[in-house]
Amino acid sequence: MEKALHRISSMNAPLPDISLTDAAPGGRPLEWVGMQGIDLPVAVAEPGCRRDVHARADVQVDLPAPHVKGIHMSRLYRLLDGLGDGTALSPAGLQHVLHAMVDSHRDCDTRSARLRLRFDLLARRAALVTDGLAGWKAYPVRIDATLSGARFELRAQVTVVYSSTCPCSAALSRHWVEQAFLAAFGHDDRVEPAAVAAWLKRHATAATPHSQRSEAVVSVALPADGATLGLIDLIDRIEHALGTPVQTAVKRADEQAFAVLNGGNLMFVEDAARRVQAALDGHHANPRVHVRHLESLHPHDAVAWAAPVREGADAC
């Protein structure tokens, strides 16, 4: 069998290519044609992050010519494969690949190409308090690059996980503790600090506010002439705005510090969306925010969206 295959492969007879020789029945132009879910190693140059990541790529071109039966997917694959050569992803590099994809399909009258990359950016994160303690945190990233004629557009989407504590629940918890304290000490004209401390040690957490793991999915436009993608800067800005990003390695002192951060950053889902949007305004073009609180009080989630307010348009 192997000898037969070798003889066949060594023949010079051209192989048929029906995408060139056969006409498309009922020919119509197609908006996009290509591939999804291609495994690809890519390099990402972000401070404090692992450089090499495993990405999944989607790539397509338009097919305006109604008579052309199909595109040349192997051409797209080979051009996409060049992104795995170890060179760090950049706006210029992505734009170059898209131009090459369009050029490779001139026989299809192709004028547009698009590329989507999905990967986890692995960042080293220090503990809040403990010196020398750190761990790795993965941030899901999506890069969308589109070339339409001479117009190049690039967007980045990142997902940041954080903790949210409900302000209403916190107020109700404080009210319960307040009433319990008055019931215990309201009849006393003078209360010893030691007695108060002892009571608080036992009863201060008799009612606790509900909190939950939450996520912010943020998309921004990236400049075509940027030297890098600037992903970790975007992530840091989001985490700083929220104030309670989830931690990696912790000791008791770090867990206590995290509890203090949660207490100082009580927020509804509306608060979180507004915080992030305000932090991005003026720093990133066309920011769009979607936040989700995976409620511990309810079996459903609380969600909110935020987008830039257009001049002359109502805020809501």
UniProtKB/Swiss-Prot annotation:
Q: What is its EC number?
A: 3.5.4.16
- Superkingdom as given in the UniProt entry: Bacteria
Q: In which pathway does it act?
A: Cofactor biosynthesis; 7,8-dihydroneopterin triphosphate biosynthesis; 7,8-dihydroneopterin triphosphate from GTP: step 1/1
Which range is the signal sequence, renumbered to this chain? none
- What does the record give as the reaction this protein catalyses? GTP + H2O = 7,8-dihydroneopterin 3'-triphosphate + formate + H(+)
Matches recorded under InterPro entries: GTP_cyclohydrolase_FolE2, GTP_cyclohydrolase_FolE2/MptA
Site positions (May be catalytically important): 166
Sum up the protein's function in the record's words: Converts GTP to 7,8-dihydroneopterin triphosphate.
What PANTHER family does the database record attribute to this sequence? GTP CYCLOHYDROLASE MPTA
- The name this protein carries in UniProt is GTP cyclohydrolase FolE2 1
Q: What organism, scientifically named, is this protein from?
A: Burkholderia lata (strain ATCC 17760 / DSM 23089 / LMG 22485 / NCIMB 9086 / R18194 / 383)
Gene name per UniProt: folE2-1
